[in-house]
Amino acid sequence: MAEALTHEQIAEFKEAFSLFDKDGDGTITTKELGTVMRSLGQNPTEAELQDMINEVDQDGSGTIDFPEFLTLMSRKMHDTDTEEEIKEAFRVFDKDGNGFISAAELRHVMTNLGEKLTDEEVDEMIREADVDGDGQINYEEFVKMMMSK
C-alpha cells in the first residue's frame, strides 16, 4: 500500500511522525495520531481515528510504528484522490455550475462521450440517482451514485 506514495510524501510523513514520537522510540501513541494527521491536512473524525487505530494497532499496544503509519496515510491519500476525482467529474457534468446536474446536462455529456441515450434512458439515470426527487442530481446524490459503482 505504501508503495503508492512518492519519496517526497514519505519524507513529509516521516518528518511529521518524528515530531510526535516524543521519546524517539519509533512509535507514536494512538492519541497522537489525530494530531499528526491534522498537521498533514487530513481531517479525520474521532470515529474514523478509532477505526484506523483498530486496523493498524494489531497488538493493542496503543502505539503505531512508522510502517503502520505509512500504510494508514497512503489509504487516506487514496481516499482523498478519489473524492477529488469525483468532484472533478461532477464539475464536468454540471455545465452551468449551479451545483446540480439536469437531464439536459447529463444528456449533453453522455452524447459527447459517444453514448447515444434516449430521453427515457437519461430520465431513468436521473431517477436512479435523484434521492430527493427534485428531477436533478446534486453533489451528494452524485457521490452516492459514483461510490455505489
Curated annotation (Swiss-Prot):
N6,N6,N6-trimethyllysine modifications at:
K116, K149
Q: Which residues carry this modification: N-acetylalanine?
A: A2
Q: Which residues bind Ca(2+) 1?
A: D21, D23, D25, T27, E32
Q: Name one GO cellular component term.
A: myosin II complex
Its keywords, alphabetically, are: Acetylation, Calcium, Metal-binding, Methylation, Repeat
Q: Which SUPFAM superfamilies match?
A: EF-hand (SSF47473)
EF-hand domain ranges (all copies): 8-43, 44-79, 81-116, 117-149
Q: Per its UniProt record, what Gene3D superfamilies does this chain match?
A: EF-hand
> Which residues does the annotation say bind Ca(2+) 2?
D57, D59, S61, T63, E68
Q: Does the keyword Chaperone apply?
A: no
- Which residues are Ca(2+) 3-binding? D94, D96, N98, E105
Q: Name one GO molecular function term.
A: calcium ion binding
Q: Please name the Pfam families in this protein's record.
A: EF-hand_7
Q: Which CDD domains match?
A: EFh (cd00051)
- The UniProt annotation places Ca(2+) 4 binding at D130, D132, D134, Q136, E141
Top-rank taxon of the source lineage equals: Eukaryota
Role this protein plays: Calmodulin mediates the control of a large number of enzymes, ion channels and other proteins by Ca(2+). Among the enzymes to be stimulated by the calmodulin-Ca(2+) complex are a number of protein kinases and phosphatases.
Report the sequence similarity comment from the record.
Belongs to the calmodulin family.
Misc: This protein has four functional calcium-binding sites.
By what name is this protein known? Answer: Calmodulin
Give the species: Euglena gracilis
Q: What is the lineage of its organism?
A: Eukaryota, Discoba, Euglenozoa, Euglenida, Spirocuta
